[in-house]
């Protein structure tokens, strides 16, 4: 009976994990003075021993310990974040150490009534039994998770060594290869290390103490890549726009900056046939020029569209939008900045390349993803302002001309976990640098900022359930883009990664997570629900719910948040619409190392969502996002490539590469129709016969085969192709192009003989 009364008292009196007054009377019983139960343990530091300590994991643990410490011995997390942010200006990566002992309440302490609550809703100890488990924590890591350089300068400052224990450090050592000798770290003195590889690279730390004990800690850093020996660029330059742009919320206009590299052709090594390739949405500048160039990879054989056109005499100019500082303490993240400012950078690059190039060949522009919007805006801006872009072809590659989509359920969930009571610092970075970036607010059709209650940073207004863009960003940008239209002096073509036949990604309203439980500790857990936006005409459907619960004999929900959504009568929700797909895990990559986030990402019912709707990538206006795309669809593009199945965003395939090559290498006919993937097919590889299929009549066709050196090795004239067609050839093994020129249409495709 006593237990039941105590339990009822607990249920009535329990408010939230964050109410530290509840734990105030336990302070005198705590030896470490850090009681972890005061915070929600997202890091699971007291449950699991991580073998690799990433920068974001270190920062999350620091944030939890800082808040759980009765004595408040550690600076606020914001101070640690400021040190990390200053690394951009200091050009060196700070290291940090965290040594601590923390306590958690034993589960049985509640069950045997060793701990209960008094009349003031405060926990009290009722016995002399041990009620706490003690956990030792020793972490060391860089405060920055990635670097674009292989030669990195590090520094460990004295004020970045956080130690709440009585242990005294005698020596600190580092190495990046287990076979190397240890290198002593001198406090407050910078030192450099060279990493031989790219990707995730190990860093090994050794902490020696005066008592003779030693701690070995493994950490990591991501090296974002460098130029390969086989693909060196001729130029690597910084470029600054000459036209400034002032975005909403900015106190002044800034000149945008970019980085460009020129990959000269493999024929004459002369800059005379430029193809511009622009980077897309890239918060944090995770791609350098070589990684952007690698976006042109396709298939399983290592083929690259850029390599193919360079063999044909074209030069590739890659434009990256890096992080930069236009003035003191201001950092602009170019990969997620205002589209207009990046467009002004591209305008300047076009002007400079036009002045440099030899001959009269006009430019080609390839704009993947957001790069398609940047290039569209820039080309049209130049036309409207009497600036000669000297461009003949604009190729949009799965670009969101009518907006992009990230499920509003995930937006709500991530924002609540980041900026609500949990204080998840790993997701804070995802929300601030990705979802809340200027570019995302311009592009996302449905944005969490459009749903928030007045004065709240996390809670949704249930009266706003239909898709709503970010205030002052989304509608303003789309209206400007619509009023400008498309470039008028170029041939405009588009590749979509979304299906043409209405194929869905999952189903509207489906559960992505259904009452999924994430166990943070023996006494703490989270219950998570996420759903895709609902079918047409359905309202008040739950799309996200987070419940934090504490175990006091039974599980009690102590704080929660929920978002509901509706779909218009004309179309089901965007999350499952046909379109270029994105992986939820990749979207939340900035939160990597967060065990709670990793848990539920590993248990999703579906791990992809519609990112760029098919209609958006083709600029087709229709109130139903699920409508089929065919020859009757009205699009501003002269030609389009649309697959029959949804593909990952900015995926190159044999089909769309053939489409791109046909557009780049051939002069267009006077009248073009949108080209779907089934229009013309060739079976690869071949032996002594070429098997081809055309769904439409190709009359008076001339078929030519060109080898890798550009030599024409086969020609046949006056051929009609309608349906299946076979052609006997005698070719040596190798790589070729086959060119079909007919009265109706022309193609150029890759051919492999083996």
For each predicted feature, which ranges?
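Serine-dependent carboxylesterase/thioesterase catalytic core
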Residues: 343-467, 478, 500-544
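C-terminal outer-membrane/trafficking sorting elements
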Residues: 674-754
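Short, surface-exposed "cap/lid" segments of acyl-processing enzymes
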Residues: 250-321, 325
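Loop/turn elements at helix/coil->beta-strand transitions in domains of secreted/extracellular proteins
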Residues: 270-275, 281, 311-317, 358-363, ...
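Bacterial Sec-dependent N-terminal signal peptides
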Residues: 1-21, 671, 735-737, 748
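Catalytic nucleophile-loop/oxyanion-hole region of alpha/beta-hydrolase
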Residues: 326-345
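C-terminal catalytic-base region of ester-bond hydrolases, centering on the histidine
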Residues: 28-124, 480-669
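Extracellular/lumenal mature domains of secreted and surface-exposed proteins
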Residues: 19-249, 663-668
């Amino acid at each position: 009976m006593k237990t039941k009364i105590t339990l009822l008292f607990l249920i009535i009196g329990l408010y939230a994990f964050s109410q530290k007054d509840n734990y105030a009377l336990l302070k005198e019983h705590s030896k470490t003075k850090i009681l972890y139960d005061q915070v929600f343990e997202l890091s699971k530091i007291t449950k699991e021993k991580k073998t690799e300590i990433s920068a974001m994991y270190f920062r999350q643990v620091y944030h939890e310990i800082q808040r759980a410490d009765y004595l408040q011995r550690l600076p606020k997390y914001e101070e640690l974040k400021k040190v990390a942010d200053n690394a951009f200006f200091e050009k060196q990566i700070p290291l940090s150490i965290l040594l601590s002992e923390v306590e958690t309440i034993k589960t049985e302490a509640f069950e045997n009534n060793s701990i209960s609550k008094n009349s003031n809703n405060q926990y009290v100890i009722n016995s002399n039994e041990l009620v706490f488990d003690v956990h030792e924590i020793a972490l060391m890591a860089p405060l920055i998770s990635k670097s674009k350089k292989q030669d990195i300068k590090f520094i460990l400052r004295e004020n970045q060594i956080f130690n709440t224990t009585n242990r005294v450090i005698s020596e600190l050592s580092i190495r990046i290869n287990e076979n190397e000798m240890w290198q002593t770290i001198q406090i407050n003195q910078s030192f450099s290390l060279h990493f031989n590889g790219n990707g995730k690279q190990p860093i090994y730390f050794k902490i020696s103490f005066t008592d003779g004990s030693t701690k070995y800690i493994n950490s990591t850093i991501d090296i974002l890549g460098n130029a390969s020996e086989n693909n060196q660029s001729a130029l690597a330059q910084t470029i600054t726009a000459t036209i400034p742009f002032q975005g909403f919320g900015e106190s002044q206009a800034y000149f945008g900056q970019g980085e460009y590299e020129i990959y000269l052709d493999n024929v004459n090594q002369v800059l005379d046939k430029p193809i511009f390739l622009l980077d897309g949405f890239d918060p944090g500048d995770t791609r350098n020029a070589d990684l952007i160039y690698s976006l042109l990879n396709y298939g399983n054989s290592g083929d690259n569209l850029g390599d193919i056109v360079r063999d044909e005499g074209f030069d590739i100019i890659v434009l990256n939008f890096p992080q930069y500082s236009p003035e003191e303490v201001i950092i602009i993240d170019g990969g997620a900045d205002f589209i207009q400012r990046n467009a002004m950078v591209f305008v300047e690059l076009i002007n400079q390349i036009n002045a440099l190039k030899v001959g009269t060949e006009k430019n080609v522009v390839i704009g993947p993803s957001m790069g398609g919007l940047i290039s569209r805006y820039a080309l049209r801006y130049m036309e409207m302002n009497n600036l000669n872009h000297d461009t003949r072809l604009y190729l949009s590659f799965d670009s969101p001309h009518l907006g992009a989509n990230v499920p509003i359920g995930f937006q709500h969930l991530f924002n609540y976990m980041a900026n609500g009571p949990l204080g998840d610092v790993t997701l804070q970075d995802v929300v601030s640098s990705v979802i809340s970036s200027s570019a995302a607010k311009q592009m996302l059709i449905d944005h969490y900022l459009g749903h928030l209650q007045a004065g709240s940073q996390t809670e949704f207004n249930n009266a706003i359930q239909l898709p709503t863009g970010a205030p002052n960003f989304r509608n303003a940008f789309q209206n400007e883009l619509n009023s400008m239209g498309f470039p008028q002096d170029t041939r405009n073509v588009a590749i979509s990664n979304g299906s043409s036949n209405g194929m869905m990604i999952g189903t509207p309203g489906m559960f992505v997570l259904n009452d999924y439980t994430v166990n943070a500790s023996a006494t703490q857990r989270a219950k998570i629900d996420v759903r895709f936006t609902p079918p047409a005409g359905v309202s008040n459907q739950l799309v996200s719910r987070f419940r934090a619960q504490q175990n006091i004999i039974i599980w009690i929900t102590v704080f929660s948040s929920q978002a509901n959504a509706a779909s218009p009568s004309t179309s089901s929700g965007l999350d499952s619409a046909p379109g270029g797909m994105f992986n939820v895990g990749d979207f939340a990559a900035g939160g990597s190392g967060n065990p709670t986030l990793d848990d539920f990402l590993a248990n999703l019912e579906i791990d992809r969502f519609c990112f760029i709707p098919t209609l958006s990538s083709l600029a087709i206006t229709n109130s139903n996002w699920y409508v089929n795309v065919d020859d009757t669809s009205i699009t501003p593009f002269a030609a389009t490539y649309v697959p029959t199945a949804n593909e990952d965003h900015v995926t190159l395939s044999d089909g769309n590469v053939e489409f791109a090559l046909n557009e780049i290498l051939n002069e267009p006919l006077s009248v073009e129709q949108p080209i779907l993937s089934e229009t013309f097919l060739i079976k690869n590889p071949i032996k002594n016969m070429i098997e081809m299929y055309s769904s439409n009549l190709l009359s008076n066709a001339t078929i030519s085969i060109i080898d890798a050196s550009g030599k024409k090795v086969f020609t046949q004239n006056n051929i009609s192709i309608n349906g299946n067609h076979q052609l006997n050839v005698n070719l040596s093994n190798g790589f070729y192009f086959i060119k079909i020129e007919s009265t109706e249409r022309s193609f150029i495709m890759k051919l492999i003989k083996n």
